[in-house]
A protein has these predicted regions:
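Conserved, short, structured surface segments that act as functional micro-motifs
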Residues: 69, 97-101, 121-177
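Residue-level recognition of beta-strand microenvironments
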Residues: 54, 87-88, 115, 132-135
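Short acidic/polar mixed-charge low-complexity motifs
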Residues: 74, 103-105, 152
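Zn2+-dependent peptidoglycan hydrolase active-site motif and core
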Residues: 78-116, 146
Length: 183
Protein backbone atom coordinates (compact mmCIF):
# COMPACT_ATOMS: atom_id res chain seq x y z
CA UNK A 1 0.00 0.00 0.00
CA UNK A 2 1.45 3.37 -1.02
CA UNK A 3 2.16 6.09 1.52
CA UNK A 4 -0.54 8.25 -0.12
CA UNK A 5 -3.15 5.49 0.29
CA UNK A 6 -2.10 4.88 3.90
CA UNK A 7 -2.34 8.61 4.62
CA UNK A 8 -5.78 8.86 2.99
CA UNK A 9 -6.94 5.79 4.94
CA UNK A 10 -5.71 7.33 8.21
CA UNK A 11 -7.44 10.63 7.42
CA UNK A 12 -10.64 8.78 6.54
CA UNK A 13 -10.51 6.82 9.81
CA UNK A 14 -9.98 9.99 11.86
CA UNK A 15 -12.78 11.78 10.01
CA UNK A 16 -15.09 8.78 10.39
CA UNK A 17 -14.46 8.85 14.14
CA UNK A 18 -15.26 12.56 14.03
CA UNK A 19 -18.62 11.63 12.49
CA UNK A 20 -19.76 10.23 15.79
CA UNK A 21 -18.31 13.22 17.63
CA UNK A 22 -19.17 15.81 14.99
CA UNK A 23 -18.06 19.37 15.44
CA UNK A 24 -20.19 22.09 13.96
CA UNK A 25 -19.06 25.15 12.04
CA UNK A 26 -20.45 28.57 12.95
CA UNK A 27 -21.99 27.59 16.31
CA UNK A 28 -20.63 25.97 19.44
CA UNK A 29 -22.79 24.20 22.03
CA UNK A 30 -23.76 26.31 25.04
CA UNK A 31 -25.04 25.46 28.51
CA UNK A 32 -28.63 25.59 27.25
CA UNK A 33 -27.65 23.43 24.28
CA UNK A 34 -25.57 20.49 25.56
CA UNK A 35 -22.99 19.01 23.21
CA UNK A 36 -24.96 15.76 22.82
CA UNK A 37 -27.86 17.65 21.23
CA UNK A 38 -25.72 18.60 18.24
CA UNK A 39 -23.92 15.30 17.71
CA UNK A 40 -24.61 12.18 15.72
CA UNK A 41 -27.52 13.54 13.65
CA UNK A 42 -25.31 14.33 10.65
CA UNK A 43 -22.15 13.09 9.00
CA UNK A 44 -19.91 14.30 6.19
CA UNK A 45 -20.63 11.93 3.28
CA UNK A 46 -17.05 11.21 2.23
CA UNK A 47 -14.43 11.69 4.94
CA UNK A 48 -11.00 12.63 3.62
CA UNK A 49 -12.34 13.86 0.27
CA UNK A 50 -11.45 17.03 -1.63
CA UNK A 51 -13.77 19.08 -3.83
CA UNK A 52 -12.86 18.67 -7.51
CA UNK A 53 -15.91 20.43 -8.95
CA UNK A 54 -18.36 22.75 -7.22
CA UNK A 55 -22.06 23.42 -7.66
CA UNK A 56 -23.03 25.85 -10.44
CA UNK A 57 -21.99 26.55 -14.01
CA UNK A 58 -19.46 24.15 -15.52
CA UNK A 59 -18.51 23.94 -19.18
CA UNK A 60 -21.43 26.19 -20.10
CA UNK A 61 -24.02 24.03 -18.33
CA UNK A 62 -25.30 23.71 -14.81
CA UNK A 63 -23.70 21.32 -12.34
CA UNK A 64 -26.27 20.34 -9.73
CA UNK A 65 -23.91 18.96 -7.10
CA UNK A 66 -20.44 18.95 -5.58
CA UNK A 67 -17.90 16.40 -6.81
CA UNK A 68 -15.75 14.92 -4.04
CA UNK A 69 -12.55 13.04 -4.96
CA UNK A 70 -10.99 10.30 -2.90
CA UNK A 71 -9.60 6.82 -3.51
CA UNK A 72 -11.67 4.33 -5.56
CA UNK A 73 -13.99 2.11 -3.52
CA UNK A 74 -14.11 4.46 -0.52
CA UNK A 75 -17.14 4.21 1.77
CA UNK A 76 -19.88 6.77 1.17
CA UNK A 77 -21.83 7.71 4.31
CA UNK A 78 -25.41 8.91 4.72
CA UNK A 79 -25.29 12.61 5.60
CA UNK A 80 -28.48 12.53 7.71
CA UNK A 81 -31.11 10.07 8.92
CA UNK A 82 -33.67 9.28 6.25
CA UNK A 83 -35.32 6.79 3.93
CA UNK A 84 -33.83 5.49 0.69
CA UNK A 85 -36.26 6.45 -2.09
CA UNK A 86 -34.09 5.39 -5.05
CA UNK A 87 -31.18 2.96 -5.38
CA UNK A 88 -30.29 2.01 -8.93
CA UNK A 89 -28.90 3.27 -12.21
CA UNK A 90 -30.12 6.60 -13.56
CA UNK A 91 -28.80 8.21 -16.76
CA UNK A 92 -25.61 10.26 -16.36
CA UNK A 93 -25.68 9.73 -12.59
CA UNK A 94 -24.74 6.07 -13.05
CA UNK A 95 -25.37 4.18 -9.82
CA UNK A 96 -27.39 6.60 -7.72
CA UNK A 97 -28.83 6.65 -4.21
CA UNK A 98 -31.46 9.22 -3.21
CA UNK A 99 -32.32 9.64 0.47
CA UNK A 100 -35.34 11.60 1.68
CA UNK A 101 -34.83 13.49 4.94
CA UNK A 102 -37.05 15.78 7.01
CA UNK A 103 -38.56 19.08 5.80
CA UNK A 104 -38.16 18.53 2.05
CA UNK A 105 -34.41 17.79 2.07
CA UNK A 106 -33.09 15.04 -0.21
CA UNK A 107 -29.48 14.00 -0.73
CA UNK A 108 -28.14 12.33 -3.89
CA UNK A 109 -25.00 10.17 -4.00
CA UNK A 110 -23.94 9.14 -7.51
CA UNK A 111 -21.32 7.52 -9.77
CA UNK A 112 -21.12 4.77 -7.13
CA UNK A 113 -19.19 1.59 -7.83
CA UNK A 114 -21.71 -0.29 -5.72
CA UNK A 115 -24.92 0.71 -3.93
CA UNK A 116 -25.26 -1.00 -0.54
CA UNK A 117 -28.82 0.01 0.41
CA UNK A 118 -32.29 -0.73 -0.95
CA UNK A 119 -35.40 1.37 -1.60
CA UNK A 120 -37.49 1.70 1.57
CA UNK A 121 -34.52 1.14 3.87
CA UNK A 122 -34.13 3.57 6.81
CA UNK A 123 -30.59 4.85 7.22
CA UNK A 124 -28.90 6.83 9.95
CA UNK A 125 -26.26 9.53 9.60
CA UNK A 126 -22.90 7.80 9.16
CA UNK A 127 -24.28 4.52 7.77
CA UNK A 128 -22.24 3.17 4.84
CA UNK A 129 -24.58 3.36 1.83
CA UNK A 130 -22.28 2.89 -1.20
CA UNK A 131 -18.72 2.71 -2.51
CA UNK A 132 -17.15 5.41 -4.69
CA UNK A 133 -16.86 4.63 -8.37
CA UNK A 134 -16.95 5.92 -11.92
CA UNK A 135 -20.36 4.93 -13.31
CA UNK A 136 -22.52 7.09 -15.56
CA UNK A 137 -21.03 10.28 -16.99
CA UNK A 138 -17.87 10.46 -14.86
CA UNK A 139 -14.26 11.04 -15.91
CA UNK A 140 -12.72 9.79 -12.65
CA UNK A 141 -13.75 7.93 -9.49
CA UNK A 142 -15.57 10.36 -7.24
CA UNK A 143 -18.80 11.06 -5.39
CA UNK A 144 -21.28 13.48 -6.95
CA UNK A 145 -23.04 14.76 -3.81
CA UNK A 146 -26.22 16.71 -4.34
CA UNK A 147 -28.68 18.37 -1.97
CA UNK A 148 -32.23 19.21 -3.01
CA UNK A 149 -35.02 21.10 -1.27
CA UNK A 150 -38.51 20.21 -2.46
CA UNK A 151 -36.97 18.73 -5.63
CA UNK A 152 -34.81 21.78 -6.48
CA UNK A 153 -31.01 21.42 -6.48
CA UNK A 154 -29.27 23.67 -3.97
CA UNK A 155 -25.56 24.11 -3.32
CA UNK A 156 -24.49 21.62 -0.62
CA UNK A 157 -22.02 24.28 0.58
CA UNK A 158 -25.09 25.93 2.10
CA UNK A 159 -25.13 23.02 4.59
CA UNK A 160 -21.53 21.80 4.69
CA UNK A 161 -18.14 23.47 4.80
CA UNK A 162 -16.43 21.16 2.30
CA UNK A 163 -12.93 22.27 3.35
CA UNK A 164 -13.27 21.44 7.04
CA UNK A 165 -15.95 18.72 6.56
CA UNK A 166 -18.19 20.40 9.11
CA UNK A 167 -21.86 21.31 9.18
CA UNK A 168 -23.19 24.85 8.89
CA UNK A 169 -25.65 24.73 11.79
CA UNK A 170 -27.11 28.10 10.77
CA UNK A 171 -28.79 26.31 7.82
CA UNK A 172 -30.83 24.18 10.24
CA UNK A 173 -33.38 24.78 12.95
CA UNK A 174 -34.12 22.69 16.00
CA UNK A 175 -37.56 21.12 16.40
CA UNK A 176 -39.01 18.79 19.03
CA UNK A 177 -37.98 15.80 16.91
CA UNK A 178 -34.48 17.09 16.05
CA UNK A 179 -32.84 19.41 13.54
CA UNK A 180 -34.39 20.16 10.13
CA UNK A 181 -33.15 22.21 7.21
CA UNK A 182 -34.25 25.85 7.01
CA UNK A 183 -36.14 26.57 3.79
Amino acid sequence: MSIRRKLLAAIALLTLTACAQSTIAEQKPTVSQPADSVRQWWCYPLPGAKVISSFGKRDGRGHSGTDLKTVPGDKILAAFDGEVVFAGTFSGYGNLIRIKHANGLETYYSHNKKNLVKVGQRVHAGDVIALTGRTGRASTEHLHFETRIDGRAVDSARYFDHNSHTLRLSAFRKTKSGYVVRK
